[in-house]
Amino acid sequence: KHSKHCIAGKLVDSNKWVRPVANDSGAELSTQQIKYKNPYGKFLTKTLQIIKFTYLKHVPLINQPENYLIDDQVWKQNYSINESEINDYLDMPSDLWGSEDRVSYNEILNKKIVIKQSLYIVKVDNFKLYKNSSNKRRASFNYNKVPYDLAVTDPFFEKNFSRINELQNILCISLGEEYRGSCFKLVAAIY
C-alpha cells in the first residue's frame, strides 16, 4: 500500500478482526510503526505472530469496519501460532462479497452492499498462483463452489509459488481501499 504496510489480525480470545491504521482515514502504517519488541530486540511484524498493541480508538470505514487507530507505543510480541493452528481462525462466509474481483464503492456508500467485515481467512479449492500478461501476481481458486481470480499482495508470492503443493490452500482475503470507484479483493496472505 503506497510503499507502506497493511497489517491485520484476529484477537486470540474472540476471533474478531482488527486492522491497525495510522489515522482516522485508514492510512497504512510506516515501517517504524509495524516493528515489535521482544527480549532480543526490535523486528518487523510477520504473519502468524501474536502481537500486543494499544490503540486510541475504533475508526471504522464503511468499507473497512475493523480499523483501529494505533497509538505511538512499540508493539510487543507475545508468541506465535504455527501454520497448523490457522484452521482455528477460519471464517465461513457464504461468499467473498459477491463473485467478482471487486465491489462497487458507490454500492457500499449507498448501502446496497453492507460490509460487515473486510477481512476473511478462508479455505479454498482448486488454488493456483500465476502471473498474468502484465506480469501481475494473481490467484485463482474456488470458494463455496464460486470461482475467483484475485490480485495477490502477499509479499511471499514467489516462495509460495515454488511450494504450492505444500500449501494448505488457506487465504487471507482483504477488501482494499477505494480505487477508481471500486474496492478490490486482495489475497493478502497465503498459507
PLM regions: where:
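A short, compositionally biased
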Residues: H2-H5, L129-R138
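N-terminal ordered "arm"
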Residues: K1-Q49
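OB-fold/S1-family single-stranded nucleic acid-binding modules
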Residues: T45-Q49, T54-V122, S133-Y191
